[in-house]
């Protein structure tokens, strides 16, 4: 299965389709290995997107849930307390 560059939700749906196909047990071994590899790759891409989103939120919100004012010069690094 070719992995397309889609948005998060589309990739998550694609991963779920792979999981469902593999769980059905009706996939030849070679196809199952190919699907598994595609699923692992998708999983890693999704994890990276989630980590990136988490870092973005951490830059915008402090530990108490209050919005931070971003310093454009330091926008790439969250403040440490």
UniProtKB/Swiss-Prot annotation:
The protein's Enzyme Commission number: 3.1.11.6
InterPro entries the record matches: Exonuc_VII_S, Exonuc_VII_ssu_sf
Compartment(s) of residence: Cytoplasm
Catalytic activity: Exonucleolytic cleavage in either 5'- to 3'- or 3'- to 5'-direction to yield nucleoside 5'-phosphates
Biased composition (Basic and acidic residues): 60-70
Gene3D superfamilies: Exonuclease VII, small subunit
Record region (Disordered): 60-81
Keyword presence, Transcription regulation: no
Cellular-component GO terms for this entry: cytosol; exodeoxyribonuclease VII complex
Role played: Bidirectionally degrades single-stranded DNA into large acid-insoluble oligonucleotides, which are then degraded further into small acid-soluble oligonucleotides.
Subunit structure and binding partners: Heterooligomer composed of large and small subunits.
Name of the protein this chain belongs to: Exodeoxyribonuclease 7 small subunit
Organism: Lactobacillus johnsonii (strain CNCM I-12250 / La1 / NCC 533)
Organism lineage string: Bacteria, Bacillati, Bacillota, Bacilli, Lactobacillales
Chain's gene name: xseB
